[in-house]
């Protein structure tokens, strides 16, 4: 029977969980603020990890840019903490990437809600 998930998928899920906890509890950089780890993609050799993040309540590009700089600066520290909590031969090099999809999804949801309201108003007026 074949496995449902590759090892890299399982490691990526664990990294997502652990990095989220580390960002919440250990990283004290004020530039980072409320950050959410939305996804992790890891290379097949487990040497590199792309960590996709979003910043809650902040859509300002300057705040996002400062937050990303804070994450990049904290990356070695996060990697060392990750190495302590996960038993991996090689702890992947972390690369943080801003995930625009959550913001786009919220914007699309708001647009749909507004269109539905306008449509309901038209039907009530008729």
From Swiss-Prot:
Gene Ontology CC annotations of this record: cytosol
Keyword Cytoplasm belongs to the record: yes
Lineage top rank: taxon: Bacteria
Gene Ontology MF: a single term: ribosomal small subunit binding
Keyword hit for Ubl conjugation: no
GO biological process: maturation of SSU-rRNA
Function field: One of several proteins that assist in the late maturation steps of the functional core of the 30S ribosomal subunit. Associates with free 30S ribosomal subunits (but not with 30S subunits that are part of 70S ribosomes or polysomes). Required for efficient processing of 16S rRNA. May interact with the 5'-terminal helix region of 16S rRNA.
Database matches in HAMAP family: RbfA (MF_00003)
Name of the protein: Ribosome-binding factor A
Lineage: Bacteria, Pseudomonadati, Pseudomonadota, Gammaproteobacteria, Pasteurellales
């Amino acid at each position: 029977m074949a496995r449902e998930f590759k090892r890299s998928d399982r490691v990526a899920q664990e990294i997502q969980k652990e990095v989220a906890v580390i960002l919440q509890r250990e990283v004290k950089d004020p530039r980072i603020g409320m950050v959410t780890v939305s996804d992790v993609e890891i290379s097949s050799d487990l040497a590199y990890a792309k960590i996709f993040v979003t910043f809650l309540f902040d859509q300002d590009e300057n705040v996002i840019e400062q937050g990303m700089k804070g994450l990049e600066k904290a990356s070695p520290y996060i990697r060392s903490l990750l190495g302590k909590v996960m038993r991996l031969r090689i702890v992947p090099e972390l690369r943080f990437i801003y995930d625009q999809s959550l913001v786009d999804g919220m914007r699309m949801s708001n647009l749909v809600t507004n269109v539905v309201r306008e449509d309901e108003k038209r039907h009530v007026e008729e």
